[in-house]
C-alpha cells in the first residue's frame, strides 16, 4: 500500500509505527459557521482514508479537532452578542448534523481547543525553556529561525519564506517569520490566566498540543486541506518537533480544493455553497460520489450540472441493486449452479482490481470505475435464472466495495420508487397542461436513469432496464 507523502513529495510504502494500528490526526473546522462543500471534501476524503484502513483490518485512532477560539469566532460572537463558547457549542452541533448526514464516521476523539488550555500553557512553557519561544509584553512567539528545518514541508527555506510571504510587521519579533503561540488579552476577547498574563492561545499551538496529548509524540498520519500546508502545518511541525526532538508525523496528506469557475471555493471569497444547502437537494451518496470522483490530490470543479450527472450515475447503480434485491425475493435456486462457480471467481477479480486502485494512494476515481464495470457485468450476466447464492454474492460484493467510500449501504428500493411515482405525477400534469416539452424531458430523464415509461389505457407503467 502506497501513500503520497507531502513531506517527501513522493509515494511511499505505508508502514505504521505499530503493526495493525494507525494514529491519525485531521485538522477539523473552525466552528463559527456551517462548513462549505470545500471543507466537506476534506472531511469526506479522510473519512474514506480511515474507512479503507479499517476495511484492510487496521485499528484507527482517528482524531479531528474543533478550533473553538480564534479571531473569526470572536468577531462573530461579538456581532451576535453571544459568548464564543455559545457560538462554538452551536456550530459543533451543526457540524455533527451535516457530517452525520454525509455518513462521515464520528472521530475517536473530537477535542476542543478551549478544553486544553492548561496543556497548551505547559506546551508553551516547555518551548520557552528549550529556547524555541520567547515572551514579549504578554505575547509569546515561536522563534522560527531556532528550528533548523523550518519550511521543510512546503519545500522552502526560511529566507525564501520571509521574502515571499505576507508577514505582519511587528518590531517586537526577533524574526519576521516568528508566529504567536500565546496572544495577550484584548478587550472583548475570552482570556485565560498564564505565566505571561491573561491571554489566549494561537491557532497553530492548539493542534500541536491536542495531537501530542491524545496521540503522543509521533503519529502515523497528519492530514488536512492543502491550504493548511503553510503556515499551519509548517508551524505545527516546528512546535512539536521543537518540543520533543522527534518526528511529529511519519506521513503528511493533503486534499486539494473544490473550485467554482476554476477559483478556490472559500468563505473569504464568498463563492461557496454550504454542505447544508447541498444536502437539502441531493442524497448524501450523490455528494460523496461527486467528492470522490477525482483523485484527492487533484482539484475538482463544482457545479449543479456535475452533481446532476453524478446523481444519474448513482441512479444506475441503485437500479442494479434494486434489481438484485427483487431477484433475490423471486428466484428458487438456492445452491450455486455449476456454471456459476467460475463466474463467482470472475466477480472476485473486480475486488482485486478495486483493492489495487485504493492501495495506490487511495485512487477513488479509478476504484469507482471498477464498481461501474462490476455493475455492467452483473447486469449482463445475472437474471431470474441465476441462483440465490450468486445473486446475494453479487449484491454483497457491490456493497462491500461501496463501504470504504461510504456509499451504497442502504436499500434504495423505496426511495427510488417514490421518486419515480412523483415524476410520473409531474409528467401527467405537464401533459394535461399541454406542456409537451416538460413531459418529454421527464420521460427522457427517467430513461437516462434506466427507467422506461409505458403509456397504457390503464395509466402509466414503468420498468427498469
Swiss-Prot record:
UniProt key word Nucleotide-binding: yes
NCBIfam families (alphabetical): cysS
Disulfide bonds listed in the record: none
Superkingdom classification of source: Bacteria
Annotated catalysed reactions: tRNA(Cys) + L-cysteine + ATP = L-cysteinyl-tRNA(Cys) + AMP + diphosphate
Keyword list, A-Z: Aminoacyl-tRNA synthetase, ATP-binding, Cytoplasm, Ligase, Metal-binding, Nucleotide-binding, Protein biosynthesis, Zinc
Short motif 'HIGH' region, span: 29-39
Entry EC no(s): 6.1.1.16
Listed name of the protein: Cysteine--tRNA ligase
One cellular component term from this protein's GO annotations in UniProt: cytosol
